[in-house]
């Protein structure tokens, strides 16, 4: 994922958390904030409680892959995806299904 599609700074994360809306399902929480830009930006947060660095990075790679596969359908928002406990046990298809479900609830797809 290109750098222009990432939310990296702490200031941006805090703005999304404080001013944005949120939706959740059992596996993900999404905070989102509408911004005037040409494309979406995403930040991904995976807690250390979910596993070691290898597991957490694998989860982040899967989330990024799902988001890139839905790139044309995603609305122009800044959003943060937070993985909840249990995500580490999901295979790619189940993770994709859960993530797309919560994105549809939020109206981002």
From Swiss-Prot:
<dbReference type="GO" id="GO:0000049">
    <property type="term" value="F:tRNA binding"/>
</dbReference>
<dbReference type="InterPro" id="IPR000100">
    <property type="entry name" value="RNase_P"/>
</dbReference>
<dbReference type="GO" id="GO:0030677">
    <property type="term" value="C:ribonuclease P complex"/>
</dbReference>
<protein>
    <recommendedName>
        <fullName>Ribonuclease P protein component</fullName>
        <ecNumber>3.1.26.5</ecNumber>
    </recommendedName>
</protein>
<keyword id="KW-0540">Nuclease</keyword>
<dbReference type="InterPro" id="IPR020539">
    <property type="entry name" value="RNase_P_CS"/>
</dbReference>
<dbReference type="GO" id="GO:0001682">
    <property type="term" value="P:tRNA 5'-leader removal"/>
</dbReference>
<keyword id="KW-0819">tRNA processing</keyword>
<keyword id="KW-0255">Endonuclease</keyword>
<keyword id="KW-0694">RNA-binding</keyword>
<comment type="subunit">
    <text>Consists of a catalytic RNA component (M1 or rnpB) and a protein subunit.</text>
</comment>
<dbReference type="InterPro" id="IPR020568">
    <property type="entry name" value="Ribosomal_Su5_D2-typ_SF"/>
</dbReference>
<dbReference type="Pfam" id="PF00825">
    <property type="entry name" value="Ribonuclease_P"/>
</dbReference>
<comment type="similarity">
    <text>Belongs to the RnpA family.</text>
</comment>
<keyword id="KW-0378">Hydrolase</keyword>
<comment type="function">
    <text>RNaseP catalyzes the removal of the 5'-leader sequence from pre-tRNA to produce the mature 5'-terminus. It can also cleave other RNA substrates such as 4.5S RNA. The protein component plays an auxiliary but essential role in vivo by binding to the 5'-leader sequence and broadening the substrate specificity of the ribozyme.</text>
</comment>
<dbReference type="InterPro" id="IPR014721">
    <property type="entry name" value="Ribsml_uS5_D2-typ_fold_subgr"/>
</dbReference>
<dbReference type="GO" id="GO:0004526">
    <property type="term" value="F:ribonuclease P activity"/>
</dbReference>
<dbReference type="GO" id="GO:0042781">
    <property type="term" value="F:3'-tRNA processing endoribonuclease activity"/>
</dbReference>
